[in-house]
Amino acid sequence: MSKLTKGRKIRLSKATAQNRRVPSWVMIKTKRAVVSHPKRRSWRRSSLKV
């Protein structure tokens, strides 16, 4: 069993936070000009370098 170091845990949680969708209030505010963000990451397609 490997233990995650604190730095790696922080980087993984940052990557999880960055991987969320665009908030609905942003879509409303921009009149659906912004509906997705191009830096969305799929867990299967791309790997993290942490």
Swiss-Prot record:
InterPro entries to which the protein is assigned, alphabetical: Ribosomal_eL39, Ribosomal_eL39_dom_sf
Signal sequence, renumbered to the chain: none
GO BP annotations, alphabetical order: translation
UniProt feature coiled coil, ranges: none
Pfam family, one: Ribosomal_L39
Listed GO MF terms: structural constituent of ribosome
Keywords in alphabetical order: Ribonucleoprotein, Ribosomal protein
Stated family: Belongs to the eukaryotic ribosomal protein eL39 family.
Cross-referenced NCBIfam families: PRK01242.1
Protein name as catalogued: Large ribosomal subunit protein eL39
